[in-house]
Amino acid sequence: MASTSVRAEFPDTVRTPPAPRTPRYRSVLLPLSFLAPALLLLGVWVIYPALQTVRRSFYADEDGTDFVGFKNWDRMLSDDNVHTAFKNNVIWILIAPIAVVALGLVLAVLTEKIGWASVFKIVLFMPLAISLFAVGVIWRIVYQQDPDQGLLNAGAKGIHDIFVKPGVLPDAQPGQGLSPRFALTKPIDAGGVAKLAVTGIAPENVPGGAKQAVTPKPEQGKITGVVWRDFKPGGGRPGVVEKQEVGIPGASVTLLKDGKTVGSTSTGDDGSFTFDDVSGGGYTAQLAPATFRAPWRGVEWLGPRLVTSAIILAFIWTAVGFAMVVIGAGLSAIPRDVLEAARTDGGNEFQIFRRVTIPLLMPVLTVVFVTQMIGVLKIFDIIYAIAPGSVRPDATTLAFEMWQRSFSGENRFGFGASIATLLMILFVPFLIYQLRSQRRNA
């Protein structure tokens, strides 16, 4: 029986039907539908106000209906306060971003070397959890000039008083028998008693440990004396030590003869003092100038000369935590084998940091730097919180001056709009640079 074989033949290629084409308008509408809410908010809250601000800068301050051209710009560019604001903005730009990036880099590197890095980062990052206005309120207290209130001056006063001790009678006045220089008006001989009365001392300003004043007895070959607060409640006799009149402890007393100092001593708790080995006469007892040295009043951090530097320091304290965290994230992304290869080639830690770590971190450092640059250009709230009203003209910036002219009672909206437009013009180069940098690193 003959058999037949059947050979199956397959086509060379298998053709699949083409996928249905999505209409072009649908491929455009779908992304736009997701972007529409963000674009709407961007247009309402950013683009439209920005365009209106530019338009308003060409209209009069009063009602915004009278077109004045570039008059607002002319006034702005010739205004002394705007010049000060621009100068302060330049100072901010030259100091704050560089300091923030440098400190953030150092702290980020150091935190990699310690075991409790997370706690350290949280502490430094904490200022960012509160607003700049609240930061300003905190630093306003820190910067108080009175050492009893301001933390910074309290610490400085403690160091200052170690080397230059304040006098015990900064506000005293000479009593009966004393010249304006707190010296006896009559000479005294050996064996005499010098009575140095002082007045004008409030009860709360009497040195601590003061006891009832006692007139010492004359002693041969010595000059004794007393320094006391010559005031008795209810009335008393001037120049006479009486009950309820206290001595002044710790007062410096000098003994002079022929205009030269021949001895010095200090008073006890009852105000008494003694000069030994004295002979002859013609001496003068005098309270030394150190007795009246005023206590250190503190640095005027919020005065016209230092207010901008003080505010920049507060800003750096706030921003350095952000820089440290971002740079620390960049450090953790650096391949460890690159660093190990550098060590194998004989590089020390400083060389590795300068020639390997920093170049690899440059994109991150650039982002942090530009971000801080934009932040200091629009700085406002921390200045409002820290600077007292009397020195705000010295601490002003362009953003603060814009608010000052527009919303603080002057109501010069055209003038303020011209400052705001100038700020936008200054922002543009930094924004373009940051966007290009992000695209390069993407």
Predicted region positions:
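Transmembrane-helix boundary motif in ABC transporter permease subunits
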Residues: 93-125, 136, 141, 333
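Membrane-water interface segments at the C-terminal ends of transmembrane alpha-helices
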Residues: 39-62, 120-188, 282-293, 314-316, ...
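Transmembrane alpha-helix signature in integral membrane proteins
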Residues: 80-110, 307-315, 423, 427
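Short membrane-interfacial helix/loop motifs at transmembrane-helix boundaries
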Residues: 18-21, 26, 39-83, 88-90, ...
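Intracellular coupling helices
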Residues: 325-365, 442
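C-terminal transmembrane helix and the adjacent membrane-cytosol boundary/short C-terminal tail
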Residues: 328-337, 415-442
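Transmembrane alpha-helical segments of polytopic membrane transport and secretion proteins
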Residues: 1-34, 116-120, 435-442
